[in-house]
Amino acid sequence: MNDLFAASPPTLEGIHIGIGGWVYVPWRAGMFYPRGLLQRRELEYASRHVSAIEINSTYYAAQKPATYATWRSQVPAGFVFSAKAPRRITQSRRLAGTGTQIEDFVGGIAELGQTLGPLVWQFEQGYRLEHEELTGFLALLPRQARGRRLRHVLEIRDAAAVDAAMLALVRRHEVATVFTDSPTYPSFADLSTDLVYARLMRSQPRLQAGYPAPALRRWAAHIQAWRRGEDPAALPHLAAPSPVADTPREVYVFFIGAAKQRNPAAAMALLQAIAAG
C-alpha cells in the first residue's frame, strides 16, 4: 500500500493543475482511488497525482486551524491548495464591512503555510455586486499571511456584474478573476495581474480522460502561453488581450463539476500534455 504514495506529478514551475476537493464517493473503488484505500489517506494519495486542489468545504464553513495543519502535513513539497472563502462573507449585504470576518478566515487558513495558494471569493448569480461595495471589499483583502504573499481571485457568476468597470477595478487592486470555461457562468479570460486562475467545467462522462486529447493539447498550449506572460487571443475576452508581460505568470487550472468522476483523469492527462509540450 505504501507504493501508492510514491508517485508524483510532473514538476512544472509556476503551473499548478488539479481538481476540486478530494472527498467524492465515485472516485473510490478504482475510479481514482485504489480499492482498499483508507478514506483518511485520500488527500495523501490525491496530492501525489495532481499538483493542486481547490478546497470547496471552506465556502460553507471555515475549518479549525488544526484541520488546516493536518492537511498541510499530508501533502508533498511543492503541492498547493487554493481555497474558496466562506459564503457568509461573499453573500454579505455589507461587503465593505466584512473586515473582521476576512481577518478571522485568513488567520485560520494561514495554518496551511507553504501549501497555501490563492483564495477564491465567489459571488453567486443574483448577488448585486455594487461597484462601491466591491471597491471597499477589495481594499480589505490582506496581501500577506504570516510573512508570505497572499493572492486573491474573484469568481463573479452574475453576468450583470461583469463589465469594463469591474475589470478596471480589479486591475487597480491587482486581484485576479476566474476564467470559467463553462456554458453556465460568465466566461472571460481578461488578465488583471500576474496570476491566472482557470476553472474548466466541460468534462464528459463517456471519455476516460474527461476531454478529447486535442482539447487537452489546446489547453496545454494556452497554459504554456499564460506562463510565458502571454494572453491567448483565442479565449473569450471583455476587452483586447493584454500585451505580453515582462515576467512569467503563475497559473492555476482546476477541473471542476461537469462529469466530476472524470476530473482527476483529466487533470493527470493535462499535466502529462504540458510536460510533453
Q: Where would I find each of the regions flagged by the language model?
A:
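Residues lining hydrophobic/aromatic ligand-binding pockets adjacent to catalytic sites
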Residues: 1-277
